[in-house]
């Protein structure tokens, strides 16, 4: 009888561990944004700016990371901001103060928005040609 109770307790512990892992994976899979950066801090406390959170509660940090309490396992966080990655060399990315929004501006004058000017075929998606242009021929 004692052995049966011990096995039941071990099985419950294993099942609880799998539930936690499934919760962590599902939270990260449900997060919007395909190119989001996510990380997990094992055994991290669930508090931010003096406020404590319980299992499943979440908060948005000032650096635009959305974090979820996975107590007692830790904290999982994903970047919610969409960062531009392919833009003309004469432009730069600026984060708007106090928001999770980004703007493309001219390096020469950050007050002016970036001028597109078409794709840069040397800096893009595997040197793919612009729509309507002929594909490069390999020799």
Swiss-Prot record:
One of its GO terms (molecular function) is CCR2 chemokine receptor binding. Coiled coil: none annotated. It holds the Pfam family PSP94. This is Prostate-associated microseminoprotein. Residues 1-35 form the signal peptide. Acts as a ligand for C-C chemokine receptor CCR2. Signals through binding and activation of CCR2 and induces a strong chemotactic response and mobilization of intracellular calcium ions. Exhibits a chemotactic activity for monocytes and lymphocytes but not neutrophils. Residues 116-139 are annotated as: Disordered. It is found in: Secreted. Belongs to the beta-microseminoprotein family. Gene3D superfamilies: Beta-microseminoprotein (PSP94) domain. Disulfide bonds join 38-78, 46-69, 64-100, 67-77, 91-114. Keywords: Chemotaxis, Cytokine, Disulfide bond, Inflammatory response, Secreted, Signal. Its main location: secreted. GO terms for biological process: inflammatory response; lymphocyte chemotaxis; monocyte chemotaxis. One of its GO terms (cellular component) is cytoplasm.
């Amino acid at each position: 009888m004692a052995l049966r109770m011990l096995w039941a307790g071990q099985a419950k512990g294993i099942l609880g561990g799998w539930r936690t892992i499934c919760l962590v994976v599902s939270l990260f899979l449900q997060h919007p944004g395909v190119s989001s950066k996510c990380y997990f801090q094992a055994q991290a406390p669930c508090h931010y700016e003096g406020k404590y959170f319980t299992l499943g509660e979440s908060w948005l940090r000032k650096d635009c990371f959305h974090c979820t309490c996975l107590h007692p396992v830790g904290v999982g966080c994903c970047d919610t901001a969409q960062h531009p990655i392919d833009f003309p060399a004469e432009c730069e990315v600026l984060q708007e103060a106090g928001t999770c929004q980004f703007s493309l501006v001219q390096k020469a004058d950050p007050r002016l928005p970036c001028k597109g000017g078409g794709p840069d075929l040397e800096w893009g998606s595997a040197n793919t040609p612009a729509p309507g242009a002929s594909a490069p021929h390999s020799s």
